[in-house]
């Protein structure tokens, strides 16, 4: 445990930030999981696209709050869109 007053404050502040960052990370990870689960359950196109928009917004918010690096956010979105686009292509081929 720190003895100096400023060090004690740094411990309090960093713990508060850690919890806030954890909440943002959990939020956007759950949004991504919702999209992947919708793809797995073969949900309609509109549902998947709506969930994808929400996931994208959650990732962008985490990037803007500096919870994750912008490149990590871009990478996560790219991988998610890759899976969504693949699913949408399979939907189109099955409809024909």
UniProtKB/Swiss-Prot annotation:
Enumerate the HAMAP family for this protein: Ribosomal_bS20
Keywords attached to this entry: Ribonucleoprotein, Ribosomal protein, RNA-binding, rRNA-binding
- What name has this protein been given in UniProt? Small ribosomal subunit protein bS20
Q: Which domain of life is it from?
A: Bacteria
Specify whether Ribonucleoprotein is a keyword of the entry. Answer: yes
Any one GO MF annotation of this record? small ribosomal subunit rRNA binding
- Organism expressing this protein natively: Thermotoga petrophila (strain ATCC BAA-488 / DSM 13995 / JCM 10881 / RKU-1)
What is the documented function of this protein? Binds directly to 16S ribosomal RNA.
Which Gene Ontology biological process is one annotated for this entry? translation
What protein family does this chain belong to?
Belongs to the bacterial ribosomal protein bS20 family.
């Amino acid at each position: 445990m720190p003895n100096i007053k400023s060090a004690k404050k740094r411990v309090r502040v960093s713990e508060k930030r850690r919890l806030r960052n954890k909440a943002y990370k959990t939020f956007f990870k759950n949004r991504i999981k919702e999209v992947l689960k919708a793809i797995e359950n073969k949900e309609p196109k509109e549902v998947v696209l709506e969930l994808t928009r929400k996931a994208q917004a959650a990732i962008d918010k985490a990037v803007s709050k500096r919870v994750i690096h912008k490149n990590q956010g871009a990478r996560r979105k790219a991988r998610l869109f890759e899976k969504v686009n693949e699913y949408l292509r399979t939907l189109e081929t099955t409809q024909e």
